[in-house]
């Protein structure tokens, strides 16, 4: 299983949250990364959707030490069917593999994408999550 995970919100190392602290213990921070997408405010957390050229979301890339175990907890936290990347229509997020950019080039990583209606949500520009805003 691919051990790479792109995070862009609550799981960022700079965010004081129990899950970001847990992730720091279960993974190695590879570094900063970007994703071609759009970021929206979904209540107290962000939602990421696929974007087009020019749409950039800034985040971090992690290498999970035990991806299978970590994804059980992460999928539950993100509202994805436990232990699987499959989702039902009621779930807000889906875990999918996408290409992300790092300072050394592109790589494929797991990303949690928002599945809800973004037309009623506030877009987070310039694609950097700040929980204080």
Question: Where do the protein language model's features map onto the residues?
Answer:
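Glycine-aromatic micro-motifs
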Residues: 1-133
């Amino acid at each position: 299983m691919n051990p790479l995970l792109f995070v862009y919100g609550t799981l960022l190392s700079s965010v004081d949250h129990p899950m970001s602290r847990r992730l720091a213990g279960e993974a190695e921070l590879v570094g900063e990364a970007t994703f071609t997408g759009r970021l929206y405010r979904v209540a107290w957390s962000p939602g990421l959707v696929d974007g087009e050229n020019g749409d950039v979301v800034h985040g971090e890339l992690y290498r999970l030490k035990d991806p299978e175990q970590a994804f059980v907890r992460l999928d539950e936290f993100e509202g994805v069917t436990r232990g699987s990347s499959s989702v039902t229509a009621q779930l807000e997020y889906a875990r999918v593999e996408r290409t992300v950019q790092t300072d050394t080039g592109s790589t494929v990583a797991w990303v949690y994408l928002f599945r809800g209606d973004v037309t009623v949500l506030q877009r987070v520009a310039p694609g950097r999550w700040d929980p204080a805003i």
